[in-house]
């Protein structure tokens, strides 16, 4: 008998069950950065879609997730205000459209069409003056 099994007990080495107690709970990069958006997923998507052959810095994912979270919060806040003005509890694509087109900076940033958003009401100034004279 070589005595290999007894050495661990005598030397006080942790057995398999003790190793689980010593492990720390993993902390996500999102919680480390104080974000709600998933930094790991953003990093993976940046790596797969970049032209740098998968080389993306760790902080690039954090910055990108922070920017996405900020823009989402901004749009949702404005859309929530629009839905509250219309006395509705649910945000619809129409409310998103009104919020984005109502803000000048968001309007220049998001130039795409929002499905189900409708159109923004607009009456030309010359038509308003013509009807006011009569």
From Swiss-Prot:
It is found in: Nucleus; Chromosome. PANTHER family: HISTONE H2A (PTHR23430). GO terms for molecular function: DNA binding; protein heterodimerization activity; structural constituent of chromatin. One of its GO terms (cellular component) is nucleus. Residues 1-33 are annotated as: Disordered. InterPro entries: Histone-fold, Histone_H2A, Histone_H2A/H2B/H3, Histone_H2A_C, Histone_H2A_CS. The nucleosome is a histone octamer containing two molecules each of H2A, H2B, H3 and H4 assembled in one H3-H4 heterotetramer and two H2A-H2B heterodimers. The octamer wraps approximately 147 bp of DNA. Belongs to the histone H2A family. This is Probable histone H2A variant 3. Variant histones H2A are synthesized throughout the cell cycle and are very different from classical S-phase regulated H2A. May replace conventional H2A in a subset of nucleosomes. Nucleosomes wrap and compact DNA into chromatin, limiting DNA accessibility to the cellular machineries which require DNA as a template. Histones thereby play a central role in transcription regulation, DNA repair, DNA replication and chromosomal stability. DNA accessibility is regulated via a complex set of post-translational modifications of histones, also called histone code, and nucleosome remodeling. Residues 16-25 have a biased composition (Basic and acidic residues). Its main location: nucleus. The keyword Signal does not apply. Keywords: Chromosome, DNA-binding, Nucleosome core, Nucleus. The keyword NADP does not apply. It comes from the Eukaryota. GO terms for biological process: regulation of gene expression; response to temperature stimulus.
